[in-house]
From Swiss-Prot:
Protein name stated in the entry: Putative DNA (cytosine-5)-methyltransferase CMT1
Gene: CMT1
Example of a GO cellular component annotation carried by this entry: nucleus
Positions of the catalytic residues: 417
PANTHER family xref list: CYTOSINE-SPECIFIC METHYLTRANSFERASE, DNA (CYTOSINE-5)-METHYLTRANSFERASE CMT1-RELATED
Length: 791
């Protein structure tokens, strides 16, 4: 790939390679390539380098060669090559030849014949790299990379066909590729490693499928677009995303969410009663969707488009034999031990009976019994309840109980990949996808392949790029491209969007061919930190390339976010309290503490009053609480300030002559604090300070090896204080134990990052963005969270 960006070594002149025909007219040449025909006077005054592309990098600039004349054709081995023909270009020894499009033929002012190439990339030369086998054979990508090369670099002509990028629908359509050596339907652009449609005339309206489910969906919900939040946690990403979309003018609703954590699901349901919250594993959710589609086809609610293998045990033939025998409708007397189904209440794919085998299950309300007798029953045993089943499926179809292919406009989610975490000492570097902890990435991709949404936003930790040379990121992009999705990759730091927290994360956009690929929102605030990202991916940090042109607000600090919160002790029993008339001291505090009715959040969720929720710290044991009391209330204080600690050459050790004791008789300075990173860390029992920016909000609050102690109070930061560092509105109440709430907040995508991405999505989905990979935000967080009718 690097070889394309350097001038090729000039080959020896060959008699069978030359320009053909007469030179083009001076007038036409100067109109088409004015930069090649600068006068000597102009050349002395003008820049000697070609300006970088808008949003591009300085290192992309190149010396502009001056021309005597231009040609529109050349002769290579007796074969005529015209402008815009595709050619093989002499490559490196032992390697495949390069592929390029000839976009200029000219004789330089020194008499040397040149051509200008626009390069094609094979899959293995792109971000896809080692996963080129996932992409269709003969498929190449036209890049935006261009440069001048001696005419002698041309090896031969090659036949490359441009074909339309097909719609992504649930219908099986045989794609017709004309006879060719290669074909392309996408462009590959190095900034943000974009794969975009090569069809510049795409029409967003053409993205609608002919599937009956989608047609029904569009008719019923013309003004609404539905979002599925996978691995949703407590809903931070989708909450911010929908608010951002709303600011852009798009009504996006989180219609479905899926997460395996019950407490996180409870939190999401409390704040978003409009959402169908599924507390189950993503792979079970996918199995359920396939069965749901089969049921909808069975009752002629959607047309059958392609075979979906049934996972249930009930065969259609058995049901057909009993079509006329429905105990619920015949009024026949029940046999002893039989019960009559009154109605179905729910559906899942699982094993509630504990048999060891997961199957399709329905929640049954039994006739003559109350809800305490409701049970999950396997679908295979409900063959005599066809009418009740049909009624349930029809009602579920109308209410969009579960998503069907074509009914989901956007999917967002962060598939957990603990197998790549830097905290995992047993990572599988050679084959990360063989690690069960990374399997959810494949499940996520399978769900996308089944539902075929218009847009996808995938989030993950930066280790996605750092681990094993970006193995999982490359696999994800290759999979999306193989499904014919456009993709764009970037990294965004929470602090860049109005939070006193660094927290850098990877975000991957994917969009259907006929949709506009969303850009990344440029930062609004300063972040004075260099992120530890691989050199290959450093330009994926959103705003890095454009930083010198941005006017950013000052970075927020911890005090800016939490100074108005009432003081609390180590133990707080109640998770609801008043603000105690404490007035917000900063703009951030003013807007983050708005009542729900004053924000862009759905008005019918959560608590409508202005109360303070979850301002509870993790309860420290007596020993740790006493240790915290030894930490001075000053900047940079930590366990090294405890009595009996000596520091030499930035390494802490115990004073052998003095060992302070706690009231319990244990040592004030625990051994784990001294041994952590061999005594060189300052994190154990570290006290935060008001003018600081927190590195990353984590899922636990123990102070043993991290800096989480409140600046002026002898306790760790509360759940609500952590939530503010993540940008949660104060009205967003959480469910579960205090430890569970810390986990939900720590796992969340920072809300303002979601807002910024939602706005970019909304603008792109309306066709209001250009082809640039970034967009400037017209607002700041959390001011943007205020509802328009409250301004």
């Amino acid at each position: 790939m690097a070889a394309r960006n350097k001038q090729k070594k000039r080959a020896e002149p060959e008699s069978d390679l030359c320009f053909a025909g007469k030179p083009m007219s001076v007038v036409e040449s100067t109109i088409r390539w004015p930069h090649r025909y600068q006068s000597k006077k102009t050349k002395l005054q003008a820049p000697t380098k070609k300006p970088a592309n808008k949003g591009g990098k300085k290192e992309d600039e190149e010396i502009i060669k001056q021309a005597k004349c231009h040609f529109d054709k050349a002769l290579v081995d007796g074969v005529l090559i015209n402008l815009n023909d595709d050619v093989y270009v002499t490559g490196l020894p032992g390697k495949l030849k390069f592929i390029a499009k000839v976009i200029e033929l000219f004789e330089a002012d020194d008499g040397v014949p040149y051509c200008r190439f626009r390069w094609y990339y094979r899959p293995e030369d792109t971000l896809i790299e080692r996963f080129s086998h996932l992409v269709q054979p003969k498929r190449v990508f036209l890049s935006n990379d261009e440069n001048d090369n001696p005419l002698t670099c041309i090896w031969s002509k090659v036949n490359i066909a441009k074909v339309p990028l097909p719609k992504i629908t649930s219908r099986i359509e045989q794609r017709v590729i004309p006879p060719c050596d290669y074909y392309y339907d996408m462009k590959y652009e190095v900034p943000y490693l974009n794969f975009t449609s090569a069809d510049d005339g795409s029409d967003a309206s053409s993205s609608l499928s002919s599937d009956s489910a989608l047609n029904c969906f569009e008719n019923l919900h013309k003004d609404e677009k539905f979002l599925l939040d996978l691995y949703s946690g407590c809903g931070a990403m989708s909450t911010g995303f929908c608010m951002g979309a709303s600011i852009s003018g798009v009504k996006l609703i989180t219609k479905w969410s899926v997460d395996i954590n019950k407490f996180a699901c409870d939190s999401l349901k409390l704040n978003h009663p409009e959402t169908e919250v599924r507390n189950e594993a993503a792979e079970d959710f996918l199995a359920l969707l396939k069965e749901w589609k089969r049921l909808c086809e069975k009752f002629s609610l959607v047309s059958s488009t392609e075979p979906v293998e049934s996972i249930s045990e009930l065969e259609d033939e058995e049901v057909e034999e009993n079509d006329d025998i429905d105990e619920a409708s015949t009024g026949a007397e029940l046999e002893p031990g039989e019960f009559e189904v009154e109605k179905f209440l729910g559906i899942m794919f699982g094993d509630p009976q504990g048999t060891g085998e997961k199957t399709l299950q329905l929640m049954v309300r039994w006739k003559g019994y109350n809800s305490s007798y409701d049970t999950w029953e396997p679908y295979s045993g409900l063959g005599n309840c066809k009418e009740k089943l049909k009624e349930y499926v029809i009602d579920g179809f109308k209410s969009h109980l579960l998503p069907l292919p074509g009914t989901v406009y956007t999917v967002c989610g962060g598939p957990p990949c603990q197998g790549i975490s830097g905290y995992n000492r047993y990572r599988n570097n050679e084959a990360p996808l063989e690690d069960q902890k990374n399997q959810q990435l494949l499940v996520f991709l399978d769900i996308i392949d089944f539902l075929k949404p218009n847009y996808v936003l995938m989030e993950n930790v930066v280790d996605l790029l750092r681990f094993s040379k970006g193995f999982l990121a490359r696999h994800a992009v290759a999979s999306f491209v193989a499904m014919n999705y456009q993709t764009r990759l970037g990294m965004m730091a929470a602090g860049s969007y109005g939070l006193p927290q660094l927290r850098n994360r990877v975000f991957l956009w994917a969009a259907q061919p006929s949709e506009k690929l969303p850009p990344y929102p440029l930062p609004t605030h300063e972040v004075a930190k260099k992120f530890n990202t691989p050199k290959e991916f450093k330009d994926l940090q959103v705003g890095r390339i454009q930083m010198e042109f941005l006017k950013l607000d000052n970075a927020l600090t911890l005090a800016d976010a939490i100074s108005d919160l009432p003081p609390v002790t180590n133990y707080v029993a109640n998770d609801v309290m008043d603000y105690n008339d404490a007035a917000p001291k900063t703009e951030f505090e003013n807007f983050i503490s708005l009542k729900r009715s004053e924000t862009l959040l759905p008005a019918f969720g959560g608590d409508p009053t202005r109360r303070l929720f979850d301002h509870q710290p993790l309860v420290l044991g007596d020993d740790d609480l006493e240790r915290v009391s030894y930490i001075p209330k000053q900047k940079g204080a930590n366990y090294r300030d405890m009595p009996g600690v000596l520091v030499h050459n930035n390494k802490a050790e115990i004073n052998p002559r003095f060992r302070a004791k706690l009231k319990s008789g244990k040592n004030v300075v625990p051994a784990y604090a001294i041994s952590f990173i061999k005594g060189k860390s300052k994190k154990p029992f570290g006290r935060l300070w008001g003018d600081e920016i927190v590195n990353t909000v984590v899922t636990r609050a123990e102070p043993h090896n991290q800096c989480v102690i409140h600046p002026m109070q002898n306790r760790v930061l509360s759940v609500r204080e952590n939530a503010r560092l993540q940008g949660f509105p104060d009205c967003y109440k959480l469910c579960g134990t205090i430890k569970e709430k810390y986990i939900q907040v720590g796992n969340a995508v920072a809300v303002p990052v979601g807002v910024a991405l939602g706005y970019a999505f909304g603008m792109a989905s309306q066709g209001l963005t250009d082809d640039e990979p970034v967009i400037k935000l017209p607002f700041k967080y959390p001011e943007c969270m205020q509802a328009k009718d409250q301004i």
